[in-house]
Amino acid sequence: MMLLVTSCSLLDTRTPESPSNTVQYDPAFDYQTVLVNLRKSIQYKDPAGYVRCLSDTTDLNATQYMFEPNIEVLTRFSGLFTKWTITQERAYFQNILSKIPTDLSCDLQLVNTIYDGITPDSVIIQSDYILTLPHTIASIPQVSSGGLRFVVKRQNNGLWSIQRWSDFLHVNDSIGETWSSIKAQFYN
């Protein structure tokens, strides 16, 4: 009896497949890495990376995430932010990304950044920002700016994340559109 075995080069190496997500994030073992990862998630349009920067509201051991919009947006979109969680963060971010052409770049610039109240497990980060999201909705500006205040805490797993996010409109802001406004307008 003769056995004939054929194969398609079992011992040959195959061409590796490209990964679906090529963004490399460092584990946030310090609070500065949270900012680096946040900027990367926006630059590379990565919702999963974006929400990883926020305190995981679904983890009962984690400090609950809270977003505080600037007062003008809070008044204009009454009730929208009362129970804002990382689920809403993901929804707004995915929604806006669906309206940005794939060949256009997003950008988050953080300037005048101050680290305050540094302890072994928390820090307050204040910064001015310019956020560029080149979406296709003509009635909504593509650039927003303002000030932010993050309370960043170390979670039980040793990783740092944003536990509280406050957004502010600067008095002399020439753009007049804050990140809060972008979140509100792209949530639905």
Model regions and ranges:
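Extracytoplasmic/secreted proteins, especially bacterial periplasmic and envelope-associated proteins
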Residues: 30-33, 37, 49, 84, ...
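Short, well-ordered alpha-helical segments enriched in acidic and aromatic residues
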Residues: 45-70
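Short, low-complexity N-terminal intrinsically disordered segments enriched in polar/charged residues
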Residues: 8-44, 52
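Surface-exposed, charged secondary-structure patches
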Residues: 72-141
